[in-house]
Regions:
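Pocket-lining segment of extracytoplasmic ligand-binding domains
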Residues: 61-62, 93, 142-197
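Ligand-binding cleft/hinge of the Venus flytrap
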Residues: 18-31, 114-137, 164-174
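Pocket-flanking alpha-helical
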Residues: 13-21, 36-74, 84-96, 114-120, ...
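A structural signal for short loop-to-beta-strand junctions that line the ligand-binding cleft
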Residues: 2-5, 71-80, 100, 104-107, ...
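Flexible hinge/capping segments at coil-to-helix
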Residues: 90-105, 128-130, 197
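Short beta-strand and adjacent tight-turn residues that come in two discontinuous sequence segments
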Residues: 38, 57-58, 76-78, 108, ...
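Short, well-ordered beta-strand elements
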Residues: 1-10, 31-37, 103-107, 135-136
């Protein structure tokens, strides 16, 4: 028996795991797999540490943070080789490049997801403490509301999820500018499979 804790709600990101279950690939290998959906109130490292799962999917920065706090996690598989993380910004804010972030409010996911962003801003020499020469960091929930409600000039999005939610809300691609972390040289590995040592 193997209980796999997803890091987020059931969506296309995890399709391969569900297809393998449906097609019997796990049972062909004598594995009885239960897939546990994640969500905004579920921290996969805590579920793994508490014995609620045998394996978890997690981003590397979050897994490294958990390991630094004493949870002996190890990566046993890395299905995603590139990052889908990006910032999605309103074009009418005048943002054309990262240097234009100064004086703006940017929504950032936390719980280990903030590290690539902080690394990026450090490389750009932009303070994350606010002010006209820095940026104001908004602790973004796992939704697109701060952008749609104009609480933030930019928000964290995934190419395969939240960006589509912004478009589905009636926003045109012409109204947006995006910055993929891969293109900025600060992307980290996502969706690794981790177990305890």
């Amino acid at each position: 028996e193997v209980r796999l804790q997803l890091q987020w709600v059931t969506q296309a990101q995890f399709a391969g795991y569900y297809v393998a279950l449906k097609k019997g690939y796990y049972s062909d290998e004598d594995l009885d797999v239960t897939i546990l959906p994640g969500g905004p109130d579920i921290a996969p490292p805590q579920v793994l540490a508490g014995g609620g799962a045998d394996a978890m999917l997690n981003w590397m920065p979050s897994a490294l943070a958990a390991r630094e706090k004493g949870l002996p996690v190890v990566n046993i598989a890395q299905p995603f080789k590139s990052s889908g993380l990006m910032l999605t910004c309103w074009k009418d804010t005048g943002i054309k490049s990262p240097s234009d972030f100064k004086g703006k409010t940017i929504g950032v996911w936390f719980y280990g997801n903030e590290y690539p962003f902080l690394s990026w801003m450090s490389q750009e020499g932009i303070s994350t403490d606010g002010g006209k020469d820095g940026i104001t960091v908004l602790r973004q929930g796992f939704n697109v509301d701060p952008l749609l409600q104009r609480q933030a000039d930019c928000i964290s999005t995934m190419t395969y999820n939240e960006y589509g939610q912004v478009l589905d809300a009636g926003v045109s691609e012409d109204e947006l500018v995006t910055f993929k972390y891969e293109d900025q040289g600060v992307a980290t590995l996502e969706d690794g499979m981790y177990v305890l040592e």
